[in-house]
Structure formats: structure tokens, C-alpha cells
A protein has these predicted regions:
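Secreted, disulfide-rich extracellular signaling modules
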Residues: 1-168
Length: 168
């Protein structure tokens, strides 16, 4: 049996800045963008900054499914699937992805990558919640406070650009 759970909110956060005009992305929100950009940013062959994807699922829905489906008597697995959308020209042949549970709440926000000027309302590298600068809540740790020790990691090598990560 397969059961699919879809995210209730998502965004990606970026620790860098524009190479064109220097505008910082630390407070930029893209919560309404259709694409989640998980990447390491390089400039002139030098690593500049990481991005992170934030995805939230309805924990009650998952918990109710587990408790009502007698999973304990059978083996099961859980996967996170992410699909590549922009082409593979910048994709490394080998890479590793880690998934961590986040320990603080966050707002998806209202921004898109193409917004000019940038939108700052919602989660960003610097803030987990931001309402037009009037009620900012910073992450305990910039880039998101996560629970160390509960992470899952997976290495990929010359595979499909689509990610099917075992998060069991």
C-alpha cells in the first residue's frame, strides 16, 4: 500500500546576495514560489552560500494514519520526493542531502523569486516570521534551528536529477 502526504507549506531560504547588485537574500521570502531551490551557490568557482528548503507536513494527519493502519505489524518506509525543474547543467555528479526536523515554527510568506523589490514577509535565512518588518522573529540560529541527531542523510551519484530520499 502507498500513502502520499503533501506539504502544508514550503519555501526556500538563501544565505547569499545578488552577484549583480549585491542585494542581500538574508531577509528575502519566496514562500509562494512554485519552485524550491536547493543548491550550493558558486561564483567564480568559489562556494558562496547554501540554500535550504523548508517543508512542513501535517503531523496529525501522519500520526492518525500510522495509528489507524496497523503499521507496526508490517515493514514500511517513508520517502521524500523532490523533482528537478530547471535542467541539470549545474548538477554535480555526486552530492549528499540531509533532512532535519526544524524545532521552531515559521511562516510560509507571500513572496516569489521574481518579486522586485524583494518580499520580506515570511520565513527567510534571518527570520522565521516577519510581518513587513513590524513583528520580526529571528531564528534561534540563522538559517533555521533544527534538531541535531534526528537527521537523515543520503548520497546520490550519477542518478536522476529527481530526488527520492529515504526518510524512514
Amino acid at each position: 500500500m502507498h500513502r502520499f502526504f503533501f506539504s502544508t507549506k514550503d519555501t526556500f531560504i538563501d544565505s547569499g546576495s545578488s552577484t549583480l547588485d549585491g542585494e542581500t537574500f538574508l531577509d528575502k521570502n519566496v514562500g509562494q514560489d512554485e519552485i524550491l531551490e536547493l543548491k550550493k551557490v558558486f561564483y567564480n568557482r568559489t562556494f558562496r552560500n547554501p540554500t535550504r528548503v523548508l517543508i512542513q507536513f501535517d503531523a496529525d494527519e501522519i500520526e492518525n494514519f500510522i495509528s489507524s493502519s496497523n503499521i507496526g505489524s508490517t515493514s514500511y518506509s517513508a520517502s521524500l520526493r523532490l523533482y528537478e525543474t530547471k535542467g541539470t547543467s549545474g548538477l554535480s555528479e555526486t552530492y549528499k542531502i540531509a533532512a532535519y526536523p526544524i524545532s521552531q515554527s515559521w511562516d510560509e510568506g507571500i513572496g516569489k523569486e521574481s518579486d522586485r523589490p524583494k518580499t520580506t514577509e515570511g520565513a527567510s535565512w534571518k527570520y522565521r516570521k516577519n510581518r513587513d518588518g513590524s513583528s520580526e522573529l529571528s531564528w534561534q540560529t540563522a538559517g533555521g534551528k533544527y534538531i541535531a541527531g534526528d537527521e537523515v542523510t543520503q548520497s546520490f551519484s550519477s542518478e536522476s536529477p529527481d530526488i527520492n530520499m529515504n526518510v524512514t
